[in-house]
Curated annotation (Swiss-Prot):
Coiled coil: none annotated. PANTHER family: ALPHA-AMYLASE FAMILY MEMBER, OLIGO-1,6-GLUCOSIDASE 1. It catalyses: Hydrolysis of (1->6)-alpha-D-glucosidic linkages in some oligosaccharides produced from starch and glycogen by alpha-amylase, and in isomaltose. The record marks 329 as: Transition state stabilizer. Pfam families: Alpha-amylase, SusG_C. Its EC number is 3.2.1.10. Belongs to the glycosyl hydrolase 13 family. GO terms for cellular component: cytoplasm. CDD domains: AmyAc_SI_OligoGlu_DGase. The keyword Cytoplasm applies. The lineage of its organism: Bacteria, Bacillati, Bacillota, Bacilli, Bacillales. Keywords: Calcium, Cytoplasm, Glycosidase, Hydrolase, Metal-binding. The active site is at 199 (nucleophile), 255 (proton donor). This is Oligo-1,6-glucosidase.
């Protein structure tokens, strides 16, 4: 396996709207990020993934782009962005931009032109179809509820939008679209960026004919089998690599809902020349029932272990894993798989240990390193996320479902859990802004904030810093093989990493109860060294350990 800088890096995702506001308008901005770079350097971050900062009407918080080569006014200017890149490079940090090219905003110039007439030169930049018998061209539903088709009076046709109606899908089968996208990518790469995270990139190739989904169900249904990992996806990614990516020393990760391990090998195998990593979602769907995301069910540790292990083993020799618990679309991990009450600190450290000792490139989401939690707003009016608001409208207003039950599912799964402002200190609005924040700060900011974390040497922040240092100083963490042990233990997640004669033993209690770890007999060693631990502990025998609630430890064995 080839050694690469992006395999050895730790990435930190910034959601700019909620990170730091420099001018008091209640919205995080680029100058706010610049002011916090030293904090991220102290943590040990190598790469910052910046969620979209391009010009946008903000229907989906910047994932609806109206100009790919301009900066959104709320975030600052291109000069601010240039300064951010310069300041990051001065600190030996790299910048990965968000590439959102499955769709644009309906306010993008391409779409404004495309709507005008059927023979406009931009018409085929998007996917237009006549209706069928007075209805939509097919029965596909949109991710944010309703139909995936929007009728447009101007030309008496419908356009496809897999997300909101203000996010029309680009027609990637049109070579001009692809070339314009590649030119835009080169614009940013020539400015000196170090990579792209690609939004729902496995949606860009739609099945020819856009077939109706065969189903007994009434209404709109997911058409994912007709656009996820579609017929030309590898052709287009290979072309993108050949024409753009391969000419720069950069890192790439493709967000790919529904991707399997076998498909991931095709996307990330080095000899295939497509992408370096994918974001897969299987471990993020384990607490969803048959009704999808909002149908919340408990996730057993056995299932979680089995799933993460499957990905570790599948990409052991081909491709590369991305490691994450959190991002801007997911609830907070300490509330989801940990214990955000009595054992918040212990369980946040335990979850970090399990993830960061695996093979792959770890991604930390803002606030994760201080153990930020989910939020419980009393009223739907305090929520801002289009997905949450549309779901509430559909379930409560249109179907009359129980408000309490719907709010409960929002508390557990809503995307705004990740989007409340970063908690910097215990001052007003957690030090995020001097104005009124665009979304309310989580009320627990007085107990959970960066200032307090930096003053306490036993904080979650310093634990993350130490995990990152372990990765930097031990090649085994980056390149060692992975093997699950105690696979049928319902309470303990334990695995072994091996690199030459070295071994790492990682042990984690996923419960609020004590439990006993027994070392499997086939693990032999002559020396043992404790590398990191989330309780006070002495070096001792490892054959039989009573683990306290959410206890985690890593040993080096020789």
């Amino acid at each position: 396996m080839e050694k690469q800088w992006w395999k050895e890096s730790v990435v930190y995702q910034i959601y700019p709207r909620s990170f730091m506001d420099s001018n008091g308008d209640g919205i995080g901005d680029l100058r706010g990020i610049i002011s916090k770079l030293d904090y991220l350097k102290e943590l040990g971050i190598d790469v910052i993934w910046l969620s979209p900062v391009y010009e946008s009407p903000n229907d989906d918080n910047g994932y609806d782009i109206s100009d790919y080569c301009k900066i959104m006014n709320e975030f600052g200017t291109m000069e601010d962005w240039d300064e951010l890149l310069h300041e990051m490079h001065e600190r030996n940090m790299k910048l990965m931009m968000d590439l959102v090219v499955n769709h644009t905003s309906d306010e993008h110039n391409w779409f404004i032109e495309s709507r005008k007439s059927k023979d406009n030169k931009y018409r085929d930049y998007y996917i237009w179809r006549p209706g069928k018998e007075g209805k939509e061209p097919n029965n596909w539903g949109a991710a944010f509820s309703g139909s995936a088709w929007q009728y447009d009076e101007m030309t008496d046709e419908y356009y496809l939008h897999l997300f909101s109606k203000k996010q029309p899908d680009l027609n990637w089968d049109n070579e001009k679209v692809r070339q314009d996208v590649y030119e835009m990518m080169k614009f940013w790469l020539e400015k000196g960026i170090d990579g792209f995270r690609m939004d729902v990139i496995n949606f860009i190739s739609k099945e020819e004919g856009l077939p109706t989904v065969e189903t007994e169900e009434e209404g709109y249904v997911s058409g994912h089998k007709h656009f996820m990992n579609g017929p030309n996806i590898h052709k287009y990614l290979h072309e993108m690599n050949e024409e753009v990516l391969s000419h720069y020393d950069i890192m790439t990760v493709g967000e790919m809902p529904g991707v399997t391990t076998e498909e991931a090998k095709l996307y990330t195998g080095e000899e295939r020349k497509e992408l370096q990593m994918v974001f897969q979602f299987e471990h993020m769907d384990l607490d969803s029932g048959e009704g999808g995301k909002w149908d919340v069910k408990p996730c057993s540790l056995l299932t979680l272990k089995e799933n993460l292990t499957k990905w570790q083993k599948a990409l052991e020799h081909t491709g590369w894993n991305s490691l994450y618990w959190n991002n801007h679309d997911q609830p907070r991990v300490v509330s989801r798989f940990g214990n955000d009450g009595m054992y918040r600190i212990e369980s946040a450290k335990m979850l970090a240990t399990v993830l960061h000792m695996m093979k792959g490139t770890p991604y930390i989401y803002q606030g994760e390193e201080i153990g930020m939690t989910n939020v419980r707003f009393e009223s739907i009016d305090e929520y801002r996320d289009i997905e949450t608001l549309n779901m509430y409208k559909e379930k409560v207003m249109e179907r009359g479902e129980d408000i309490e039950k719907v709010m409960q599912s929002i508390y557990i799964k809503g995307r705004d859990n990740a989007r409340t402002p970063m908690q910097w200190d215990d001052q007003n609005h957690a030090g995020f802004t001097t104005g009124e924040p665009w979304i309310t700060v989580n009320p627990n900011y007085k107990e959970i904030n960066v200032k307090q974390a930096i003053q306490n040497k036993d904080s979650i922040f310093y634990y993350y810093k130490k995990l990152i240092e372990l990765r930097k100083n031990n090649e085994i963490v980056v390149y060692g093989s992975y093997d699950l042990i105690l696979e049928n233990n319902p309470s303990i997640f334990a695995y072994v990493r091996t690199y030459g004669v070295e071994k790492l033993l990682v042990i984690a209690n996923f419960t609020a109860e004590e439990c006993i770890f027994e070392l499997p007999e086939d693990i032999s060693y002559s020396e043992v060294e404790l590398l990191i631990h989330n309780y006070d502990v002495e070096n001792g025998p490892i054959e039989n350990i009573t683990l306290r609630p959410y206890e985690a430890m890593v040993f080096k064995l020789k």
